[in-house]
Amino acid sequence: MPDQNTPDMQLIAFKGLIEHILNHCRRVLQHINPIFQRAGVDYFTHFYLIINKLIVVEAMSKLEIRESPDAVTTYEMYRAIKEIKKLKKSIPKEHRQQLQMANFHKCFQRNVNQWIDLATERCRSRIKQAIELDTVVQVTEDVQFSSSAVDGTEFLLLLMKLSDELEWPAKAEAFTFKIFVVKSVCECALFYVSEVYNRLRPEDMFNQQGNFRATEKLSIVLNNMQHIKTVIMKHLMEHSLEQSGKKLTEEEQDIQTHSKEVMGTIIQSAGEDISTKLASIICQIILKISPDITALIEAIVERKTPTTSLEMSVIDPLMSYLASNLHTLGNHLLTPVFQLILTDMWCMSSDCLQRVLNSDAAKKSSDRSQYTIQRSNSSYRASESSSMLMVLGSTWRA
């Protein structure tokens, strides 16, 4: 049986006492004090002033004797005292100035980083478990991402709310804690992206011959990463730009401005890191299809300028290859991800065509092909979404 007199056990017992006092305060306000008030006695004020001194003095002593008190216990204690403090509005104003509880948060200042670390650790653990239990979630008739992206988003949003739940009275310190929370959310978002990225296997992107193939799992992984990036970055930016509800001193305003700049940098960096992971997968796709597209373009350019409908079919193998790969991706990917792939595929095809034009073998049809590039690039700049397929086909069939 554990020793009840250890500092740990005393802290846990005191936390339970505070929670009991909170419940009793609410019961006194609702049921007991009205009875006393009918007799002209303000029972709640007397009771509140007594527990005010007891809580602050005892809480400080219990926390000071521990070098590293349990984070869960201290956080639950802090929340309970915070709720008790809010009840001061139920006592006369002249008594509120006497409250030692007004600065109770100072007792817990050294514990805040522990709370953030614990919340971050729990968020990462929940994210990992969500990935282990992944199931497919239908977004539209074709587009999908997995349950871990939905659950992961919820876990990240819960972590993000920690700085608001603290309601830390000292604004300068509150801004610092908010930065720590934003940093933790970004780290957990990157943890999710890295976990789903590392679970992507070669067979999810390539067949046994090493050729690219668009699979459901590839689409889901890309959609998951994009979903986390879009939702979390949006909420984080809104969170970082929130204004303090209280009037700030000039010094606090300067700290708030600096804090927003720091948080903006952290969020932007996290977004770029997620984009880098996405780009890494897309790069693998483009590298795999590059040899096939190069061969198909070389076959087109080596032909003379088409003059009959039979010769015009020389473009069809390239059109068919691009369409077969883009069709599946276009149907199953979120639009921003598909746009990234389409853009890179177009740039790679355009670069390949330019290289072929510069070769000796392409001299016979260089004028016609140069016109193709110029017209294609012009059209692509006007509309990125699908011009690659349309322009190549229409140019050679003109």
Where on the chain are the PLM-derived regions?
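Extended alpha-helical scaffold/tether regions of large eukaryotic proteins
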Residues: 1-398
